[in-house]
A protein has these predicted regions:
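A broadly tuned preference for mixed-charge, low-complexity surface segments
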Residues: 93-106, 157-179, 226-240
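Predominantly flavin-linked oxidoreductase catalytic cores and closely associated redox partners
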Residues: 3-144, 160, 165, 181
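C-terminal helical "tail/cap" subdomain of flavin- and related membrane-associated enzymes
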Residues: 206-306
Length: 306
């Protein structure tokens, strides 16, 4: 759709250098971008970096920010029962410091995958989960976008988990989505954040070009906007750390104390949950279960949806 209204899509192109061009008054005017591909070099007024977890612009321009990553892989499977819900499992046996998912799609198809801090063992954990559950006899297939004849294998990669990069704007450039580190550090969802940040960046860049001002100060409007909108990552990270300190039994007890919807709870409802936990397993309150519950609330789809 974007191409229909003027965008140009260049496949098999890889950026290797980005050079700022300045006028005689030392004011930034445009970019000269080079790389591997027939259309290079390319000149443009501004750059929105949506290069994913690699963060191309951040590395090429040495913006002095790094992100921690987690491994995420999934299979596409067939004949998977679909009750209309997404299944998520906090199951350390199969996904240390992560979780497993089953995301149903049309026609009995589903994406079954996991994220874990154990990047080398991720695919083995996924295979074990499928083999040990109701999915064992379900056929695996390659996703539609993969070429015919290729061996069936999981697809995925790394996902940023440490929160936003400290710097998401610079002269003439804005980082969005995974390139900016925008994923939930608890559940690693990032599609909602990528869509929101891409739209916000486009609006800010459009206005900045109209004003002929692509300075850091002008583009900082974007960074202020996401800082205001996104929930506090540091609180979610505290909750995540506390969550993975719980045993399987403690997680189950906590889950049975929760309502179906964690958002918009009144202070009285929150107190009620605390009382339930106190009676069922008092030690949970000493294991910082409250930050866990708060991080669940912050990580609802309203804020960090897929």
């Amino acid at each position: 759709e974007a191409c229909d209204i003027g965008a140009e899509l260049l496949l098999s192109h890889r950026v290797t250098s980005m050079e700022r061009v300045f006028n005689s008054e030392n004011q930034f005017t445009n970019w000269k971008i080079d790389g591997r591909g027939n259309e290079f070099p390319i000149e443009c007024r501004a750059v929105i970096d949506a290069s994913g977890v690699a963060g191309a612009a951040s590395k090429i321009l040495d913006m002095k920010t790094e992100v921690e990553v987690i491994a995420g892989f999934q299979y596409e499977m067939l004949d998977v029962p679909n009750d209309g819900y997404l299944d998520f499992y906090l199951w350390p046996k199969y996904s240390p410091h992560g979780y497993v998912w089953m995301i149903p799609k049309e026609g009995g198809r589903a994406n079954v995958g996991l994220v874990t801090t154990d990047k080398k063992g991720a695919i083995k954990y996924l295979e074990d989960f499928i083999q040990d559950t109701y999915l064992a006899d379900k056929p695996k297939v390659n996703p539609p976008w993969r070429k015919d004849g290729i061996k069936i294998k999981p697809f995925g990669g790394t996902i940023p988990i440490s929160g936003p990069r400290e710097i998401t704007v610079d002269t003439g450039v804005i980082l969005v989505g995974d390139a900016a580190g925008f994923t939930s550090p608890l559940f690693e969802g990032g599609s909602h954040l990528a869509l929101w940040s891409g739209r916000e960046a486009a609006q800010v860049i459009t206005q900045a070009i109209a004003e002929n001002d692509l300075s850091v100060k002008r583009l900082m409007v974007y960074q202020k906007a996401w800082l205001k909108r996104f929930p506090p990552y540091n609180k979610i990270l505290k909750g995540k750390t506390a969550l993975y300190d719980l045993t399987d039994e403690e997680m189950s007890i906590m889950a049975h104390c929760l309502p179906e919807e964690l958002g918009n709870m009144s202070p009285l409802q929150k107190l009620g949950i605390g009382i339930k936990i106190l009676f069922k397993k008092p030690i949970l309150l000493t294991k910082r279960v409250i930050p866990v519950l708060l991080s669940f609330g912050y990580s609802r789809a309203k804020h960090f949806g897929w």
